[in-house]
Regions:
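Conserved N-terminal segment of class I S-adenosyl-L-methionine
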Residues: 1-102, 107, 111, 124, ...
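A short His-aromatic
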Residues: 112-116
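Helix-to-beta-strand junctions that scaffold the AdoMet/dcAdoMet cofactor pocket
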Residues: 117-118, 131-132
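Short N-terminal helix/helix-N-cap motif within the alpha/beta-hydrolase-1
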Residues: 118-122, 147
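Short, glycine-/aromatic-enriched active-site segment of Class I SAM-dependent methyltransferases
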Residues: 137-161
Length: 218
């Protein structure tokens, strides 16, 4: 499975920066409220963007004030991310031991990555280990993802590990024990007159996207 230049071009990823950025902000607002912590003020804090792709999330984090490091398994993606942002970017696999110090990041983000991984539980454990604060992830919901994405002509065959909320709860309980919350949402986005309209709607069980927030217990 390759996540190099052709993958991003086939997915028209370069045209999605404003959509990705809006999605990231909505999820961080939700996670801040849910975990009772201010993730929108990154001044004096460090953030890690797991699966940074072209660096759109990393740029949002940097704009919020975080000292940001991003990494991706794609060398091409990490190179583009470095060109798009002033953040630091690495090439590595989230499923293996990360070349980063334990308990060193106030915020770890992982947006729409877990579904691509053969062993997402290893990635979750690695993210938890390097975090000293909050881990925020999003991933498609198996209950509805294949049907809706095919109807929208947007299904990604590299989604090899799509799970339900119940399945993620079991994985998180085994992997990190406690301190996590999951909810499902459906994001509605459309353009009108050149302006992007974006609305997140919480739909229990059947939302298209599973949101995960983990607050590390000290």
């Amino acid at each position: 499975m390759s996540f190099e230049e052709n993958y991003f071009k086939d997915r028209k990823y370069s045209a999605k920066e404003d959509l990705v950025s809006r999605h990231v902000m909505e999820v961080l607002k939700w996670a801040s409220k849910t975990a009772h912590t201010d993730l929108l003020n990154g001044n004096g804090k460090r953030a890690l963007d797991v699966g940074c792709a072209l660096g759109y999330t990393s740029r949002v984090l940097s704009d919020l004030g975080y000292e940001t490091i991003g990494f991706d398994i794609s060398s091409w993606g990490a190179k583009q991310a470095k060109n798009n942002s002033c953040s630091q970017f690495l090439v590595c696999d989230a499923q293996v031991a990360l070349p980063l110090a334990l308990d060193s990041f106030d915020l770890v983000t992982c947006f729409d990555v877990l579904e691509h991984l053969a062993c997402p539980e290893k990635a979750i454990r690695n993210m938890f280990d390097v975090s000293k604060g909050t881990v925020v992830c999003t991933t498609p919901n198996k209950k509805v993802e294949r049907l809706i994405r095919k109807l929208l002509w947007d299904y990604d065959e590299t989604h090899i590990n799509v799970k339900t909320l119940a399945a993620w709860r079991k994985i998180l309980a085994v992997t990190i024990g406690e301190g996590f919350i999951l909810e499902s949402f459906y994001d509605v986005a459309f353009r009108l007159g050149g302006r992007l309209f974006f609305k997140s709607i919480r739909i229990p069980t059947y939302g298209l996207t599973v949101r995960i927030v983990v607050k590390k217990q000290r």
